[in-house]
Amino acid sequence: MTHKEMSEIFAVMLLAYPNAEVFKGGIAKLGPTINLWVTCLPEIDFWTGQQAVVKLVRECKFPPTIAEFKEKAEKVQAEVRARIDQAWNYLKLDMGLGKTPEEAVARLPEGTDIRRAIEAMGGPSRLIATGERTFGDGTVKTYEYYNYDGFKSAYETIIRQTSALNSGPRKAVGPGMKQIGGKT
């Protein structure tokens, strides 16, 4: 994560925890702290950091430590991997039972993230890829394999386009709900 991106994460925490001692003086005085966080969290990308900070703000009364932030970010990454693997296993099971990729995809409900990922890959036919293997005697054999890497990349892109895991954009106030201040 860059310093600018970490500053955005800290801006969210500043809003969530305005009375915390660490934020006295605002973002301008947090330079060394932000440098430390960036140095300690090189493996966390901005999107994962955003998801982690949203979850932490919902769950914690106090600003998180670097270790708590990293732990939550790792949980976000694990959730993404689990979601991708679950979708892939569903597709692979159907294809393993003799269904073509087109038949496996046809069973999926319209508008799902899995379908959008497959469309982003270039269609159901891209779920199976072709490779070549050269043997020691110079013979070349063609083989087919499940294109997990292509699916994983496309599905992760789709997940990252949504505002939070397992949800789309949320309305702040639904019909009949009261806002803060009592207005409907």
Predicted segment positions?
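Charged interaction scaffolds used for protein-protein
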Residues: 1-184
